[in-house]
């Protein structure tokens, strides 16, 4: 049986602004540990800061955005999505295949 090769992914995650800094760090750690627990590797995490949402999600108008580049075997993505749906601190997430890790992102954050 042929072993599947890990692919590069770009994950966008939006966390609730009601979280304290410590709770937000733990929520992000829960996402990253989920990836590594399935044999994935975190390559880069971009903290994009607090931003206004395009529309209200669960009563929230703003969220903390993170962009994570990671590698994992493709079959793991469905398992990660199941975990993300159970994470109440995570307002939204999106996972896409990526061609390369972007080292620099340019976004403006809202003032705290």
UniProtKB/Swiss-Prot annotation:
Record InterPro entries: Ribosomal_bS6 (IPR000529), Ribosomal_bS6_sf (IPR035980), Ribosomal_S6_plastid/chlpt (IPR020814), Transl_elong_EF1B/ribsomal_bS6 (IPR014717)
Keyword Amino-acid biosynthesis carried by entry: no
rRNA-binding keyword on record: yes
The entry's keywords: Ribonucleoprotein, Ribosomal protein, RNA-binding, rRNA-binding
One GO BP annotation of this record: translation
A Gene Ontology term for the protein's cellular component: ribosome
GO molecular function terms listed in the Swiss-Prot or TrEMBL record: small ribosomal subunit rRNA binding; structural constituent of ribosome
Task performed by this protein: Binds together with bS18 to 16S ribosomal RNA.
Similarity field: Belongs to the bacterial ribosomal protein bS6 family.
NCBIfam families tied to this protein: S6
UniProt name for this protein: Small ribosomal subunit protein bS6
């Amino acid at each position: 049986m042929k072993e599947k090769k890990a692919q590069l992914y770009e994950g966008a995650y939006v966390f609730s602004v009601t979280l304290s800094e410590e709770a937000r760090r733990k929520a992000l750690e829960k996402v990253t540990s989920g990836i590594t627990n399935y044999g994935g590797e975190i390559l880069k995490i971009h903290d994009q800061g607090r931003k206004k949402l395009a529309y209200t999600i669960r009563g929230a108008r703003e969220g903390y955005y993170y962009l994570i580049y990671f590698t994992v075997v493709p079959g793991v993505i469905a398992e990660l999505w199941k975990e993300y749906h159970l994470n109440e601190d995570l307002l939204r997430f999106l996972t896409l295949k990526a061609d390369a890790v972007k080292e620099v992102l340019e976004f403006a954050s809202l003032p705290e």
